[in-house]
Design a protein with these regions (language model features):
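Conserved SAM-binding loop
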Residues: 18, 72, 264
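Short, solvent-exposed amphipathic alpha-helical segments in soluble enzyme
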Residues: 88, 279-283, 449-453
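Short coil/loop residues immediately preceding or within conserved phosphate-binding loops
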Residues: 39, 323, 416
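Conserved helicase motor core of P-loop NTPases
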Residues: 6, 25-29, 37, 152-157, ...
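C-terminal accessory regions
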Residues: 337-475
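ASCE P-loop NTPase helicase motor core
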Residues: 27, 31, 36, 40-224
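Conserved pre-motif I regulatory segment
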Residues: 2-40
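Short, conserved phosphate/pyrophosphate- and ester-handling motifs at nucleotide-, phospho-/glycolipid
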Residues: 22, 76, 268, 426
């Protein structure tokens, strides 16, 4: 099919006259599809309010209308769910698509790409890391390397990476490698790229997007010497919440849009802990440590519990990912062992079609300031559980018993009413509360600007800025 047909059909699927930036992206996409080179790829970069999501959906619908195969991927379960809702096509996480487990309890190797003539579209690509993770059980430990290798090992398969360079880059990286044409061309790929910068007219009426654009411009111009001033006047979708009104306002959000559509975003685990305790005690009136209906976040990848379920249910996810949100259905059998606290939980996974799973969880991580068990705590748990198998003669057999031990594999969890921005990234909620903590002009860094932009753009309907200082308010 000629490139011109793709252009016409995508514009029709869009349903309105594209902006100049969108038209350029459509033209570039058509050229990318027309290129006969097996190693062509495309980067579609765009910030909040520029119509990137709308354009991505139009591209997906056009490809399907032309009976072309598409696969939609995202780095997290929540991001995949958002991508699927915006495009009308199921999406999955990158890990679930490209890796498969060699054996029970074993590492995950790169799966063969059995698809042919398929376009792989990956949303929220700014989150894709390529720093080799020590002790990673996934492929090479470099997710971007593995993704590129997987896609291009399939006959006539291609990759489109979609994302926002203004968002936080992956932890430990200066920029998002998946959105860098220089980095991607290093794989020997021919890179087509397009940037959406022009904010759509309807987006300019949104206080969230107006202010996000002001913040983004501070990133791109590299001249930020003062903290951004936020405009509240004239925008009903962005409000300042004094601390003494927070409990009542949060309770209103929970009743209006529900817990699944409300999120508090903070700058540290310590601050998130304070919020989580306060919300449970003063908004939800929960006294027990864990109760039915509690929202939790998994804070360390876990393979053990899904393996147990796989034997009887082949639709079970391959693993539970760090960052997955779950809802408690039942709580049973609290006990103390090895110097730690454990509990049996029946969990529901809203981002995975409400999949249900029974696990043993470790509750010591609920209130700690560390992201998960500290190295010292992990070593203590290892030593204590290993001591139980002291009578087992050989070291390999002791390790085998350890890997099959439910307490050593207990799920590490935190409350999920308030999270850090890295944990919120990839997700969107109707009501988002942002607490940046104490800030001065001297504390201004590029990382803070990326943080603030990412936090602002998690909200789809209303943004609440908690204890926002007058010095950062536009007069």
């Amino acid at each position: 099919m000629y490139a011109i047909n793709y252009k016409t059909l995508i514009v029709q699927a869009l349903g309105f006259k594209p902006t100049a930036d969108q038209q350029h992206a459509i033209d570039t996409f058509a050229e990318f599809l027309a290129d006969r080179d097996d190693h062509a790829t495309m980067l579609l970069r765009g910030s909040a309010g520029t119509g990137k999501t709308t354009l991505s959906g139009a591209i997906v619908r056009t490809m399907l209308a032309l009976k072309q195969r598409v696969v939609l991927l995202a780095p997290t379960g929540r991001a995949a769910k958002v991508f699927a809702l915006n495009s009308g096509v199921p999406a999955s996480t990158i890990h679930r698509r490209i890796y498969r487990q060699q054996s029970l309890g074993g590492a995950f190797s790169l799966a063969p790409n059995m698809m042919t003539d398929t376009l792989f579209l990956v949303d929220e690509s700014s989150m894709i890391a390529n720093e080799g993770l020590r002790e990673s059980v996934f492929g090479t430990g470099c997710l971007l390397d593995d993704l590129v290798q997987f896609v291009y090992s399939g006959r006539n398969c291609r990759l489109v990476l979609i994302g926002d360079k203004a968002q936080l880059p992956p932890v430990g990286e200066e920029e998002s490698p998946a959105l860098s044409s220089a980095f991607i061309s290093g794989y020997g790929l021919t890179v087509y790229e397009s940037d959406l910068r022009e904010v759509l007219r309807q987006s300019q009426q949104s206080g969230i997007l107006y202010n996000a654009t002001v913040i983004r411009q501070m990133i791109t111009h590299d001249e930020a010497i003062a903290l951004p001033k936020i405009r509240f006047s004239g925008f009903p979708d962005i409000v300042c919440v004094p601390g003494d009104e927070l409990i009542e306002t949060l309770a209103t959000s929970y009743s209006q849009v529900g817990m699944d559509e409300t999120m508090v975003v903070t700058r540290s685990n310590k601050r998130a802990n304070i919020y989580n305790q306060g919300i449970r005690n003063q908004v939800l009136w929960r006294e027990e440590e864990l109760t039915s209906g509690d929202w939790l976040m998994v804070v360390k990848n876990s393979y053990y519990w899904t393996e147990q379920k796989k034997a009887e249910d082949t639709s079970a996810p391959a693993f539970i990912a760090n960052g997955d949100r779950v809802v408690i259905q039942r709580v049973r059998n609290r006990r103390d062992l090895y110097g730690f606290h454990f509990v049996d939980l029946w969990l529901q996974f809203p981002d995975y079609d409400n999949y249900e799973l029974q696990v043993t969880a470790l509750t010591d991580t609920l209130a700690t300031e560390a992201p998960a068990l500290t190295r010292e705590q992990s070593q203590q748990l290892f030593d204590e559980v290993m001591a139980d198998y002291a009578d087992v003669r050989t070291k390999p057999e002791r390790y085998k018993r350890l890997k099959a031990d439910p307490y050593y594999n207990a799920l590490q969890i935190k409350y999920a009413y308030a999270v850090t921005c890295h944990k919120a990234q990839g997700g969107q909620w109707a009501h988002v509360y942002v607490d940046q903590g104490y800030m001065t002009d001297e504390m201004l860094t590029p990382d803070y600007i990326h943080w603030l932009y990412t936090a602002f753009t998690r909200a789809t309907e209303k943004l609440f800025l908690v204890n926002w200082p007058k010095t950062q308010t536009e007069e």
